[in-house]
Curated annotation (Swiss-Prot):
GO molecular function, one term: transaminase activity
Assembly information from the UniProt record: The glycine cleavage system is composed of four proteins: P, T, L and H.
Family: Belongs to the GcvT family.
Gene Ontology BP terms: glycine decarboxylation via glycine cleavage system
Lineage: Bacteria, Pseudomonadati, Pseudomonadota, Gammaproteobacteria, Alteromonadales
Enzyme class (EC, first level): transferase
NCBIfam families in the cross-refs: gcvT, PRK00389.1
Keywords, comma-separated and alphabetical: Aminotransferase, Transferase
Function description: The glycine cleavage system catalyzes the degradation of glycine.
Xref: Pfam families: GCV_T, GCV_T_C
Name of the protein described by the UniProt record: Aminomethyltransferase
CC annotations in GO: cytosol; glycine cleavage complex
Gene3D superfamilies: Aminomethyltransferase beta-barrel domains (3.30.70.1400), Aminomethyltransferase fragment (4.10.1250.10), Probable tRNA modification gtpase trme, domain 1 (3.30.1360.120)
Originating organism: Shewanella baltica (strain OS155 / ATCC BAA-1091)
Catalysed reaction equations from the record: N(6)-[(R)-S(8)-aminomethyldihydrolipoyl]-L-lysyl-[protein] + (6S)-5,6,7,8-tetrahydrofolate = N(6)-[(R)-dihydrolipoyl]-L-lysyl-[protein] + (6R)-5,10-methylene-5,6,7,8-tetrahydrofolate + NH4(+)
Length: 364
């Protein structure tokens, strides 16, 4: 029996096509994935992300514990509400999950982890917390709605109270703030401005309906995937997992090497990998017909004339650009052109940074 979010009936009311997503009944689309995608790029769309897992880490050792648990360094967070993206690694530097951590106080942090990795993550966090003065509490009574797009903030403002709007006025990107019963964050998975709103389950349906009434378009997993891929954002399980280190997943920027005496889990293995050199994650663009897909092989010849092979981790048709884009893991000697094998023939592709669309515009 699949899990259902508190918004399940609201999805059915909007004629959602429901699919199983890692044990959750979730909307794939509400009729047109392309229309949903374009709504987020041009206006405002919303996603039920209540299947995500909210975990509060509280206690005298909260900071010290998270500095060991995560490859990024929560000690960088000095302003209440500031958020940090990064990886939680195992001892071999494989990525257990990627997650966002919010700094609330020196003894209180909020962590949001993926739904597909929930049980594994919670078990790992509990195991690693032994010996630290911390309490790790999952918050299943909280739902989450992401409102994204150039008009998302204005439309969300119409459903928030005057006090809530005052609390979040001028909030910079990658911050979160408790505003009444809501935790409102300027984060997202689309490359657009907007909010991710953590809302008590008993208020979630009313908030969803209020956003619908403001003309915010409900969007499913299909649009969520094309939007995040255009934005060059990783999907756990495709672009990285426990067999992949963050340097090979375009996550090098999330690793806090300094201070050098911070012994985060996986550090020694990661230093060895860094010094030896790893594969890297790049973007691919194919302007001729066809769609780049997960697991297609990528070939290129280096400056010495040696052929190398990599693989597409995520690929799709980009509605914003009008052609296919992909992310691929390849040896780091790649230049700015390559070939992808499709239907038993090789097709030329351009190699770009894995970031295709930002704020509705081409980003490469």
């Amino acid at each position: 029996m699949a899990n259902k979010t508190i918004l399940f009936n609201k999805h059915l009311e909007s004629n959602a096509k429901m699919v199983d997503f890692h044990g959750w009944d979730m909307p794939l689309n509400y009729g047109s994935q392309i229309e949903e995608h374009n709504a987020v790029r041009q206006d405002a769309g919303m996603f039920d992300v209540s299947h995500m897992t909210v975990v509060d880490v509280i206690g005298n050792d909260a900071c010290a514990f998270l500095r060991k648990l995560l490859a990024n360094d929560v000690a960088k967070l000095k302003v209440p509400g500031k958020a940090l993206y990064g990886g939680m690694l195992d001892e071999n530097a494989g990525v257990i999950d990627d997650l966002i951590t919010y700094y609330l106080t020196d003894t209180n942090y909020r962590v949001v982890v993926n739904s597909a990795t929930r049980e594994k993550d919670l078990a790992w966090i509990a195991k690693q917390s032994q010996g630290f003065d911390v309490t790790v509490t999952e918050r299943p009574e909280l739902a989450m709605i992401a409102v994204q797009g150039p008009n998302a903030k204005a439309k969300a403002a119409a459903v928030l109270s005057a006090e809530q709007n005052a609390a979040i006025e001028g909030m910079k990107p990658f911050f979160g703030k408790q505003a009444g019963s809501l935790f409102i964050a300027t984060t997202g998975y689309t490359g657009e401005a907007g909010y991710e709103i953590i809302v008590p389950e008993n208020e979630a349906e009313a908030m969803w309906q209020a956003l619908l009434d403001q003309g915010v378009k409900p969007c499913g997993l299909g649009a969520r995937d094309t939007l995040r891929l255009e934005a060059g954002m990783n999907l756990y399980g495709l672009d990285m997992d426990e067999t992949i280190n963050p340097l090979a997943a375009n996550m090098g920027w999330t690793i806090a090497w300094e201070p050098s005496d911070r012994d985060f889990i996986g550090r020694k293995a990661l230093e060895t990998l860094r010094d030896a050199g790893t594969d890297k994650l790049v973007g691919l663009v194919m302007e001729e017909k066809g769609v780049l897909r997960h697991d297609m092989p990528v070939f290129f010849t280096d400056s010495a004339g040696v052929e190398h092979q990599g693989v597409i981790t995520s690929g799709t048709f980009s509605p914003t650009l009008g052609y296919s884009i992909a992310m691929a893991r390849v040896p780091n000697s790649i230049g700015d052109t390559a070939e992808v094998e499709m239907r038993k023939k090789r097709v030329a592709v351009r190699v770009v940074a894995p970031n295709f669309v930002r704020n509705g515009k081409q980003a490469f």
